[in-house]
Amino acid sequence: MIEHDHVKDDHIKDDYAVAVPFYDLWHEDGHVPLVRELLPPLLKGVERSVIEIGAGTGLITRVIAQETPARIYAVEPSLGMRSVLVNRLAEDPRLLGRVTVLPCGALDVEVDEPVEAIVMISVLQSFPAEQRAELWRVLARQLQPGGRLVFNWRERALPVPGDLEVMGSYAVGRHAYEVAGQVLEAAGESVTSRFVYRIRQRGVAISEDEVVVTNHWPAGERLAAELRAAGFDRDAAPEGMEMWRLP
């Protein structure tokens, strides 16, 4: 059975546009409600500035904005996702003045001054082992001393390849927006999955697109060792979340 998570890669831009119409529907049915509950206490005391890695369409951006008065740097490489995010900001003049949208990936982010916090929700799996060391270096360079790195994470058993299964179906007017997925290959910490996005009318598919993506799920011990090697210290966080600080 395929895991239900945000699957996005910093190197996939317009190819991921096929998922944009399904994005909020699927993620509101997935990890986003839990993150809304778990993230706010981890941002307590943050007042000046936050980087959000992989802002997507802005679902978590709004959570950050509600819980802190800080300026937000929303990093999003996908043009399709970024377009929805900017349109969402345009609906609220207060957010439009606080959120700077950066059209780049996590490895290329640079902001004007060190920030108090970096938030990264369902993005870490996009980075293979050979890129994560650079990721930690880049993020550490953006944080002020004592700054916090917050992300969601949990241990996972290696999935078994299988058949395509419907993971969610959502009514939009008289249409059903359907997301299906299957694991194609799993080895070590890498899992290659296929996702199919269909729009159905009276049960008949009138639109169908697919994306194949490889995600990377290191063991918790390895992840902790990488972060410590990059100079981070672990801080307390609820189950399902991680918080690490620079000394």
Residue ranges: model-predicted function:
Residues 153-218:
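SAM-dependent methyltransferase
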Residues 133-145:
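A short glycine-rich, Lys/Arg-flanked "PGG" loop and its adjoining helix->strand segment in the class I
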Residues 216-247:
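C-terminal lobe and adjacent flexible extensions of AdoMet/dcAdoMet transferase-like proteins
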Residues 110-118:
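A short acidic, Gly/Pro-enriched loop at the edge of an enzyme's catalytic core
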Residues 146-153:
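Conserved beta-strand signature within the Rossmann-like core of class I S-adenosyl-L-methionine
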Residues 59, 64-108:
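Class I SAM-dependent methyltransferase SAM/SAH-binding core
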Residues 1-56:
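Conserved class I S-adenosyl-L-methionine
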